[in-house]
Regions:
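Alpha-helical transmembrane segments within multi-pass membrane transporters and channels
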Residues: 2-41
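Structural signature of hydrophobic alpha-helical transmembrane segments
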Residues: 4-14, 80, 151-161
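Generic alpha-helical transmembrane segments of integral inner-membrane proteins
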Residues: 9-21, 47, 81-89, 129, ...
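Transmembrane helix-loop junction
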Residues: 23, 27-28, 49, 95, ...
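Membrane-helix/interface signature in polytopic inner-membrane proteins
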Residues: 89-129
Length: 172
């Protein structure tokens, strides 16, 4: 019985906190980021199962919240426009700002980036926080689109994400 806006803010705060924890595990404890992400994802999944009692949550979203994910503009779902805006913002950051260059440098060769003066720990930590925040945004939009929450949704997207990392030639 919580307003959708408040639930969205809490969701984003929780996701950002998960990003901070991931950053700590990767940067301070020196755990491989892929392994840390999978491990923390499992812990978060267990917490979600416990909190939700493994139930689907339906018919509790307001019509306004559902419109946020279901409306169309010019015959195209609004979710496409959200993705387009996010993509443009991320592209701009990556291609036209020092932070974007630092992210590319850190991802390409962390040691060389560090020797060039890039604060690689800060970049890795910030990237994990930003990724977690964006995952929260995606979860909110997804819930608005389908009109429900279930703890079984996330794991269905894990294998395609791992495959994307693998086929994208990322270092595991």
């Amino acid at each position: 019985n919580m307003p959708a806006g408040l639930a969205a803010v809490i969701t984003l705060l929780v996701c950002t906190t998960v990003g901070v924890i991931s950053g700590f595990v990767v940067v301070k404890l020196k755990v491989n980021s892929f392994i840390a992400t999978l491990g923390i994802g499992q812990v978060v999944s267990a917490i979600v199962l416990k909190i939700s009692f493994n139930r689907q949550i339906t018919d509790t979203f307001s019509p306004t919240f559902e419109k946020f994910g279901r409306n169309q503009y010019l015959g195209i779902p609004v979710v496409f426009y959200y993705l387009l805006i996010a993509g443009i913002v991320i592209w701009y950051i990556m291609e036209h700002t020092p932070v974007g260059r630092f992210i590319y440098a850190t991802g390409g060769n962390p040691e060389a980036a560090r020797l060039a003066g890039v604060k690689t720990d800060r970049i890795v930590w910030g990237s994990l926080i930003a990724s977690s925040f964006l995952a929260g945004v995606a979860g909110i939009v997804f819930s608005a689109k389908v009109g429900l929450f279930t703890s079984a949704t996330g794991p269905n997207y894990l294998f395609p994400a791992i495959a994307a990392v693998f086929f994208g030639a990322s270092q595991l």
